């Protein structure tokens, strides 16, 4: 069936306008991008499958959405000329007949280009036919336009264009080559047209990436593992042909949960590969092909690229089958390199920095692998599979911009396996390739669904599978050991269980030393070859703003030559020298009005460098060496008018700041994929649950449903709902109602979502565990009851109902985990027995550890700290005489502010230390509260230098220096049992005084003193009692010490 040719007119003019704007703006010295060209020539010949995606047809797809063979485009800075054929004829003799029959709409190119006339940018279409004279006239007009536009003309010298139409143009153009200078325009097309993608382009690349991920994880991995497990023989070429055929299986792609419902499998095609390699022969270049060797265990490399609506995505993975220790170590290092590169894929990064940081890490950590590391860490990707002008090597000075798409590749080639005795596995290569979008603050990895972690890529078909099991058992043993601990609380500090098992304490101290050493080493490896932020603060970037593009956009009121506040354009227009001068609100600091005599004065202060040393002194400017206007003062007799203007400017400034703040708050909110509802059956539901944070309106219970790729909370009012996708779930918790008023299921998200007008990372579904109680005293039932039978029955019923609630919610949480198991969703339950109270926000709450986190889920604001994100914990205010201490968590992401849990009772100190040690978190302690803002600025400013100077050891050093004094102080003031008994007797005697005792004591102090035993007598009694109990002085001293 013929394809209906419809050119998106809006997209055409938007893209052409942005291209022309970039062209006109390129007036820097040396004309770095466009090379000072006055015109650009894009020539398309006949369709050529071998050169299907070059810059010339990429320009066709970018502007028109289609490739039109035998077409010439000539651009000047204000107009576009198109020379094309009217119908199929001698100009298309070598064009593939199947292509033309499938796209009969292409036979009349002029017809489809005709609607582009009359737009905001002039487009002239010159139609040619079989008549040579007519074609010559069209070419002559284009040549005249090129000569008039300037000496330099942009061409694509590396692109090939064949066929009669192309040959005719080349002959015609040869006549003016002596009059013009040809400039390679491909870098300009890359930067101004293809690099930064709009929304439609990003959606196409994302869908292509999801198709790649699905084909890799849902098909190739299953096929590969089945062949190896069943020990079947198959060549790389045969396996790649199987994958090749799978692209025509529309049902397979329809089943992939990540692909949207509107995804059209008919629009996908291969961009590269598929390529499968194993058995010691590897080629990591894009030109590689699958050979006829058999698939072998060891290192298996698989890669391919898929094109959707002409936009490409690429993926490559390395699979380790029964790997050696050195192979596992090198792959783990490759993951470290991958994270290092990904961390800097963000707006404003220089392209060469990505490669330089990766190679710097190789040189610092494994210099023997430097010669094996790939020559670049990726390239630009889009319509072209690999943009040669955006290769991420050590020489590319281009700046990454938000909206760019890149293929990021880290790899090791031809590494020798010293442990191998088999020549087929003596040499191996490894590669990880992902397609990513450059974001404001980091990358969006489109191909992340095909896992790259060790668990996802490792396969053990031999005897090496067994040793992996103890890891999980070890974790459970630690948790069980902790839950058996019982803390006794007493009234007096002297009676608290301050004694610690010396053997356990020594083991814990030794373990903490190992963790501290490990942290320092990890820090040096992680930040090798990196540079920190200046002064520990990420520098702000200047954001351009514009009040009006043209004079005719100015408001009509400017003719009155009065001060005018244009709220729509966020601009203040001031008449200067008889002309209206606009000042954008972003340039204004504040405005104030004052009176002096019969005049009112309006003073407008502008932002400029060096205005002070306050918090806002880091205001960025485009050129700080330029001349700046500091302030402007206007005088008028119209007092009310100036007062109104000052108020309007103040309001405008407030609104601008509020909008900026709202935009900043919403930066990390990403648009979720659509929830795929279950249609063929009723979804599993949990009724009568409340939502936190709640939806706007009346508080009423709703129900939670489990669908194919997420949860949906349905409100009974106004058909409102909240969707939570499994792919966005970081933690899933179930907390029973024991000792609580509610039973709950809590979801902690990777990226925040919007619920109503609130941004949140935590979504909670709960039901109250208690019912209203009624006093039945005096009613008819009560008359026939004796004793506490009724109260006993109510308690029994309460226990039964709570147990039923726990069973219902736990079963539903397990069903959620089962539905989301492909996304790694698992249920976690807090350990109440090892919980401790503290103040993470405003109120004192119970904080409970889980297997993977530390949580407080009972009352908002919630606390969820992921354990593997913690760098170190520090215990503050640990000193004798204080009833509580504070706990500070520092995260591996040093830009993330530390989390404080304050006012933890000192009785919990040993329990907290035991728990931290059991989950392998390094901790230190000290007597004072530290200024963590200053500390983290120091760390961020030079992280490598920080770890080189000892890292977090300064916290431990502070603890050690205070430890001796603390012990002495405690042992000096702590009472022995005999002294405490004597003190208690004295207290009892004091309590027998009458109301006038205080007055008598003040009048006759000496008599009161003589009436009791002195301290020497008490000391003698205490020693005698100790001797009787068999304790000498040394043992008693040990007992008193902590």
Swiss-Prot record:
Q: What is this protein called?
A: FACT complex subunit spt16
Q: Where is the composition biased (Low complexity)?
A: 973-984
Query: What SUPFAM superfamilies would the database entry show?
Result: Creatinase/aminopeptidase
Give an example GO biological process: transcription elongation by RNA polymerase II
Note down the stretches annotated as region Disordered.
Answer: 464-519, 776-795, 958-1042
Compartment(s) of residence: Nucleus; Chromosome
Alphabetized Pfam families for the sequence? FACT-Spt16_Nlob (PF14826), Peptidase_M24 (PF00557), PH_SPT16 (PF24824), Rttp106-like_middle (PF08512), SPT16 (PF08644), SPT16_C (PF21091)
- Positions the record marks as coiled coil are 498-522, 636-672, 796-819
Keyword set for this entry?
Answer: Chromosome, Coiled coil, DNA damage, DNA repair, DNA replication, Nucleus, Transcription, Transcription regulation
List the gene name: spt16
Which stretches does UniProt call biased (Polar residues)?
Answer: 480-489
Which Gene3D superfamilies does this one have?
Answer: 2.30.29.150, Creatinase/methionine aminopeptidase superfamily, Creatinase/prolidase N-terminal domain, FACT complex subunit Spt16p/Cdc68p, Pleckstrin-homology domain (PH domain)/Phosphotyrosine-binding domain (PTB)
Q: What is its main location?
A: nucleus
Q: By its UniProt entry, which InterPro entries does this protein fall under? A: Creatin/AminoP/Spt16_N (IPR029149), Creatinase/aminopeptidase-like (IPR036005), FACT-SPT16_Nlobe (IPR029148), Fact-SPT16_PH (IPR056595), FACT_SPT16_C (IPR048969), FACT_SPT16_M (IPR013953), Pept_M24 (IPR000994), PH-like_dom_sf (IPR011993)
Q: Where is the composition biased (Basic and acidic residues)?
A: 467-478, 504-519
Recorded source organism is: Aspergillus oryzae (strain ATCC 42149 / RIB 40) (Yellow koji mold)
How is the quaternary structure described? Answer: Forms a stable heterodimer with pob3. The spt16-pob3 dimer weakly associates with multiple molecules of nhp6 to form the FACT complex.
Q: Which family does it belong to?
A: Belongs to the peptidase M24 family. SPT16 subfamily.
Is Transmembrane set as a keyword in this record? no
What are the record's GO terms for cellular component? Answer: FACT complex
């Amino acid at each position: 069936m013929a394809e209906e040719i419809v050119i998106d007119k809006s997209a055409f003019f938007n893209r052409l306008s942005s291209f022309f704007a970039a062209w006109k703006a390129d007036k820097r010295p040396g004309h770095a991008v466009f090379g000072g060209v006055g015109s650009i020539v894009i020539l398309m010949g006949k369709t050529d499958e071998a050169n299907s995606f070059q810059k010339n047809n990429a320009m066709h797809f970018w502007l028109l959405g289609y490739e039109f063979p035998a077409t010439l485009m000539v651009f000047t800075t204000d107009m576009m000329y198109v020379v094309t054929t009217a119908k199929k004829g001698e100009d298309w003799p070598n064009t593939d007949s199947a292509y033309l029959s499938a796209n009969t709409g292409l036979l009349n190119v002029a017809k489809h280009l005709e609607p582009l006339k009359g737009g905001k940018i002039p487009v002239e279409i010159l139609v040619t036919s079989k008549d040579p004279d007519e074609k010559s006239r069209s070419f002559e007009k284009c040549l005249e336009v090129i000569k008039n536009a300037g000496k330099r003309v942009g061409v694509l010298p590396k692109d090939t264009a064949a066929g009669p139409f192309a040959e005719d143009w080349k002959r015609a153009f040869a006549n003016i080559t002596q009059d013009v200078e040809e400039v390679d325009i491909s870098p300009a097309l890359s930067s101004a047209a293809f690099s930064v993608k709009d929304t439609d382009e990003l959606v196409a690349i994302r869908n292509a990436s999801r198709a790649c991920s699905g084909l890799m994880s849902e098909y190739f991995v299953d096929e590969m593992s089945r062949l190896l497990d069943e020990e079947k023989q198959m060549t790389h070429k045969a396996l790649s042909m199987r994958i090749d055929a799978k692209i025509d299986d529309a049902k397979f792609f329809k089943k992939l949960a990540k692909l949207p419902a509107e995804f059209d499998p008919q629009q996908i095609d291969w961009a590269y590969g598929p390529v499968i390699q194993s058995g010691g022969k590897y080629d990591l270049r894009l030109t590689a092909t699958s050979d006829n060797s058999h698939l072998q265990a060891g290192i298996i490399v698989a890669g391919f690229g898929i094109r959707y609506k002409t936009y490409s995505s690429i993926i490559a993975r390395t699979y380790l089958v029964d790997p050696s220790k050195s192979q596992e170590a090198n792959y783990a290092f490759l993951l470290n390199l991958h994270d290092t590169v990904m961390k800097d894929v963000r707006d404003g990064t220089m392209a060469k920095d990505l490669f330089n940081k990766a190679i710097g890490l190789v040189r610092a950590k494994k210099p023997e692998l430097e010669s094996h590391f790939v020559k670049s860490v990726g390239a630009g990707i889009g319509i072209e599979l690999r943009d040669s002008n955006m290769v991420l090597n050590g020489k590319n000075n281009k700046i990454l911009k938000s909206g760019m798409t890149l293929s990021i590749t880290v790899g090791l080639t031809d590494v020798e396996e010293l442990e191998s005795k088999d020549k087929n596995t003596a040499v191996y290569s490894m590669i990880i390739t992902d397609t990513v979008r450059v974001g404001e603050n980091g990358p969006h990895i489109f191909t992340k669904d095909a896992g790259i972690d060790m668990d996802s890529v490792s396969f053990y078909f031999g005897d090496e599978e067994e040793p992996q099991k103890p890891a999980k058992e070890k974790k459970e043993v630690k948790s069980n050991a902790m839950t058996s601990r019982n803390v006794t609380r007493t009234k007096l500090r002297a009676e608290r269980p301050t004694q610690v098992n010396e053997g356990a304490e020594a083991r814990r101290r030794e373990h903490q030393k190992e963790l501290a050493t490990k942290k320092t080493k990890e820090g040096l490896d992680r930040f090798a070859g990196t540079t920190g932020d200046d002064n520990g603060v990420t520098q702000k970037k200047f954001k351009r703003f514009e009040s009006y593009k043209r004079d005719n956009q100015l408001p009509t009121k400017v003719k009155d030559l009065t001060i005018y506040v244009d709220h729509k354009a966020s601009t203040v227009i001031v008449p200067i020298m008889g002309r209206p001068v606009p000042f954008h609100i972003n340039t204004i600091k504040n405005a104030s009005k004052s009176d002096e005599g019969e005049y009112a004065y309006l003073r407008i202060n502008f932002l400029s460098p060096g205005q002070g040393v306050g918090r806002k002194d880091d205001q960025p400017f485009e050129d700080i060496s330029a001349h700046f206007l500091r302030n402007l003062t206007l005088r008028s007799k119209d007092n009310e008018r100036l007062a109104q203007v000052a108020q309007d400017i103040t309001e405008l400034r407030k609104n601008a700041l509020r909008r900026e703040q709202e935009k900043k708050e919403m930066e990390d909110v990403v648009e979720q994929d659509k929830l795929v509802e279950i249609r063929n059956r009723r979804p599993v539901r949990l009724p009568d649950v409340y939502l936190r944070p709640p939806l706007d309106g009346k508080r009423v219970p709703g129900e939670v449903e489990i669908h194919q790729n997420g949860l949906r909370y349905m409100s009974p009012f106004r058909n409102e709902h909240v969707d939570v996708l499994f792919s966005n779930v970081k933690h899933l918790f179930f907390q029973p109602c024991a000792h609580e008023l509610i039973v709950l299921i809590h979801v902690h998200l990777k990226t925040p979502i919007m619920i109503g007008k609130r941004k949140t990372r935590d979504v909670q579904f709960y039901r109250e565990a208690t019912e209203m109680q009624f006093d039945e005293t005096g009613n008819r039932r009560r008359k026939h009851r004796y004793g506490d039978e009724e109260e006993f029955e109510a308690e029994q019923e309460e226990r039964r109902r709570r147990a039923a609630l726990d069973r219902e919610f736990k079963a539903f949480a397990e069903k959620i985990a089962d539905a989301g198991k492909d996304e790694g969703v698992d249920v976690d339950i807090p350990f109440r027995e090892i919980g401790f109270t503290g103040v993470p926000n405003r109120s004192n709450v119970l904080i409970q550890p889980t297997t993977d986190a530390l949580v407080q889920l009972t009352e908002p604001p919630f606390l969820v700290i992921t354990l593997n994100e913690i760098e170190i914990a520090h215990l503050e205010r640990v000193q004798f005489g204080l009833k509580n201490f504070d706990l500070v968590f520092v995260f591996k992401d040093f830009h993330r502010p530390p989390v404080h849990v304050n006012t933890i009772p000192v009785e919990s100190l040993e329990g907290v230390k035991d728990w931290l040690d059991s989950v392998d978190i390094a901790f230190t302690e000290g007597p004072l509260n530290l200024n963590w803002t200053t500390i983290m600025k120091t760390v961020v400013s030079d992280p490598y230098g920080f770890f080189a100077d000892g890292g977090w050891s300064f916290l431990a050093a502070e603890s050690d220096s205070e430890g001796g004094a603390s012990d002495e102080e405690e042992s000096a003031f702590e009472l022995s049992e005999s002294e405490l008994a004597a003190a208690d007797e004295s207290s009892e005697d004091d309590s027998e005084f009458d109301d006038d005792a205080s007055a008598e004591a003040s009048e006759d102090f000496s008599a009161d003193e003589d009436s009791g035993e002195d301290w020497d007598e008490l000391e003698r009694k205490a020693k005698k009692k100790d001797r009787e109990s068999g304790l000498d002085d040394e043992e008693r001293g040990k007992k008193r010490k902590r």
